[in-house]
């Protein structure tokens, strides 16, 4: 399919250097320019020319077949009992084989006008051969013939066979072609002439006028007027090649048309998504100002909190995580570190922290969901905060995170996860993704009441809500997404608290990033399948299903799956369409993304100088994410089971946050 698309693009170059003719540097030979006529052959270096007999006109039509004007010309010729010679583009013949067959069936003659209309004098040797051979293949596949008549594109009268065109003409005649040009306009029909037309409305009107000329006895084909043999039957191999060419052309054309629609729809959806994110982000800001904690009618939540920290081989960052929690302004905490069978010193480091609020539970390795359920069973408080063991909390994060739970309908709250280790290009790209992608999405999800994920790095829950859905399920690899969807289906609302900031460590190598995102994507698609029934639900569950699941399916599965195809078609546009127009569309879309990303960074209180890396992110990072989605979907379709993939921690997030140039930022409204 890709090869067919490339061939379709080559056949339909909008900008093609081989279709532009250079000025002649030497005149046509005298035997051609001042010869007996416009039909030219070369036999053993001897130039022979011929003209139509008196009162005989050979009507010739270049290009096409055109689906609009060729049928009208054929109808006109049939009505006047006239015949003509059609010099066809091979590419058009392959696209419209029925018209080629009609031309032949109605007694008209077919010649070659090359495959794409390339100027043969400007073509490379390979292009020269392809232009002629592919046209013969198209004719063999449609009407089972090999033509010996050739009209070279961008030539009219014999004297236009000058400079490079004459060299190309000699090569063509060496292949057995007879060259057909046209008589000059000053020659009268009664003298006998070859008249040249295109297959257009103008040609139709001029042909109709010429057919009424009383000085002409016969309108016929070039070969009939001169007694030439224009065809030989095509061989079996040529017919097979021609048939394959026609089918390949049809496939490439269908794929090109489909991709035009896909690219248009995907581009429109992308722009609408960006506009929607900006609109709903602003709506979220206004909502925070009116209806969320800080408003006089919302009580302050001061109840004690249990913090669950599941950990597996997290010795690099567990101490920073626990100490950041102990520095919380919300003092009434129960911090439970659940060591899930670590093979390093995670449990020892956590147990060595001398604070009565910290408890360490050891269990055999059973996975993150099991560790969280173990901690939930030991929780003493009605409010549960779940934290990844590589996350560092701001001092006021816990207190801010639990404030939306003042509303009795709220069952869970997502915090604002920020990238702590931002040194390096890969980390900067993920920082942009967290602000521009994840956090803008969460603002929109809250307004639309369809939050899809409370991240494992920072999230608050009602204990009753967790127990009501059976705790944390291990049915999927994205237990946080699975849990969030289950809460919506149970009738709970889920909100986003932007001011509750926690810093997480992101992968610093492509291998680690791939494994992490593969797990996220695989688990998210699993959760979508598990909770697909929410689409048909009512009330809170139904709103979540129809909005949240539809959004995930469209923008996180379908469009990424189409991304490689869209990229191929974008490359097609650069190579075969107007490159300036294609580049203009791409830069316009990039500008929209930069503006949206800048707005997202401003809302999160972040510096906007990171935007310089965004063009590179689009070319490299997003392609990686698209491939992750493709691999996840293929793995699910094949029934593959993916194990939990743990990322090797370095503790650099905590070091960089507390370093000489900390990334402290406060969301703005």
PLM regions: where:
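N-terminal pre-catalytic segment of deacetylase/amide-hydrolase enzymes
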Residues: 1-59, 66-79, 208, 215-246, ...
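Membrane-embedded multi-pass helical conduit in multi-pass membrane proteins
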Residues: 268, 278-299, 551-638
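Catalytic domains of cell-wall/extracellular-matrix polysaccharide-remodeling enzymes
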Residues: 117-226
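Long helical/loop segments within the catalytic core of UDP-sugar-dependent glycosyltransferases
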Residues: 364-365, 369-377, 381-382, 387, ...
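A conserved acidic beta->alpha catalytic loop
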Residues: 324, 331, 339-347, 366
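N-terminal signal-anchor transmembrane helix
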Residues: 19-20, 39-52, 278-332
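Cell-envelope/extracellular polymer assembly enzymes that use nucleotide-activated donors
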Residues: 303-306, 334, 467, 482
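Active-site beta->alpha N-cap acidic-glycine motif
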Residues: 23-141, 145-146
């Amino acid at each position: 399919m890709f090869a067919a698309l490339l061939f379709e693009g080559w056949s339909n170059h909008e900008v093609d250097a081989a279709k532009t003719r250079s000025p002649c540097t030497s005149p046509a030979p005298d035997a051609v320019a001042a010869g007996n006529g416009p039909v030219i052959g070369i036999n053993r270096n001897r130039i022979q020319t011929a003209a139509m007999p008196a009162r005989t006109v050979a009507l010739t039509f270049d290009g096409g077949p055109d689906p609009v004007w060729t049928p009208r010309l054929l109808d006109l010729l049939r009505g006047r009992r006239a015949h003509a010679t059609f010099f066809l583009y091979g590419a058009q013949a392959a696209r419209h084989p029925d018209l080629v067959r009609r031309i032949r069936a109605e007694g008209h003659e077919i010649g070659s006008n090359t495959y794409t209309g390339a100027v043969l004098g400007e073509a490379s040797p390979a292009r020269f051969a392809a232009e002629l051979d592919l046209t013969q293949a198209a004719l063999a596949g449609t009407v089972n013939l090999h033509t010996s008549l050739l009209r070279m594109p961008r030539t009219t009268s014999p004297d236009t066979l000058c400079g490079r065109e004459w060299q190309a003409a000699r090569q063509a005649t060496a292949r057995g072609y007879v060259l057909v040009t046209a008589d000059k306009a000053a020659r009268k029909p009664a003298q006998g002439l070859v008249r040249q037309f295109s297959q257009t409305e103008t040609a139709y009107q001029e042909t109709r006028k010429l057919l009424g000329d009383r000085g002409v006895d016969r309108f016929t084909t070039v070969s009939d007027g001169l007694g030439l043999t224009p065809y030989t039957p095509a061989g079996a191999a040529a017919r097979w090649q021609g048939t394959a060419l026609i089918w390949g052309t049809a496939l490439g054309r269908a794929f090109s048309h489909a991709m035009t629609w896909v690219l248009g729809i995907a581009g429109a959806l992308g722009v609408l998504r960006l506009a929607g994110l900006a609109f709903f982000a602003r709506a979220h800001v206004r909502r925070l100002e009116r209806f969320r904690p800080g408003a006089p009618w919302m009580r302050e939540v001061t109840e004690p909190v249990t913090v669950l920290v599941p950990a597996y081989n997290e010795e690099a960052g567990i101490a920073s995580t626990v100490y950041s929690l102990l520095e919380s302004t919300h003092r009434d905490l129960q911090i439970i570190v659940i060591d899930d069978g670590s093979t390093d010193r995670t449990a020892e480091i956590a147990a060595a922290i001398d604070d009565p609020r910290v408890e360490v539970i050891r269990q055999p390795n059973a996975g993150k969901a099991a560790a969280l359920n173990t901690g939930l069973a030991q929780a003493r408080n009605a409010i549960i905060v779940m934290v990844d063991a590589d996350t560092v909390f701001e001092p006021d994060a816990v207190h801010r995170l639990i404030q939306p739970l003042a509303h009795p309908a709220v069952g869970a709250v997502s915090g604002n996860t920020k990238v702590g280790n931002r040194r390096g290009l890969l980390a900067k790209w993920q920082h942009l993704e967290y602000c521009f992608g994840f956090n803008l999405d969460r603002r929109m999800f809250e307004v639309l009441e369809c939050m899809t994920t409370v991240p494992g790095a920072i999230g608050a829950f009602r204990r009753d809500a967790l127990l009501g859905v059976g705790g944390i399920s291990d049915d999927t690899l994205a237990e946080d997404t699975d849990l969030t969807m289950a809460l919506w289906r149970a009738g709970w609302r889920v909100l986003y608290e932007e001011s509750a900031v926690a810093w997480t460590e992101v992968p610093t190598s492509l291998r680690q990033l791939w494994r992490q995102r593969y797990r996220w994507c695989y688990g998210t698609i699993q959760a979508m399948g598990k909770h697909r029934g929410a689409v048909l639900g009512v009330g809170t569950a139904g709103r979540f299903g129809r909005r949240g699941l539809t959004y995930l399916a469209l923008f996180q599965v379908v469009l990424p799956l189409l991304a490689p195809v869209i990229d191929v078609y974008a490359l097609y546009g650069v190579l075969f369409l107007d490159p300036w127009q294609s580049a203009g569309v791409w830069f316009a879309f990039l500008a929209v993304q930069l503006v949206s990303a800048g707005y997202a960074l401003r809302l999160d209180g972040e510096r906007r100088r990171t935007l310089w890396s965004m063009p590179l992110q689009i070319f490299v990072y997003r392609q990686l994410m698209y491939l992750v989605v493709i691999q996840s979907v293929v793995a699910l379709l094949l029934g593959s089971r993916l194990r939990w993939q743990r990322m090797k921690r370095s503790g650099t997030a905590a070091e960089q946050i507390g370093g000489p140039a900390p990334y402290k930022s406060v969301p703005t409204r």
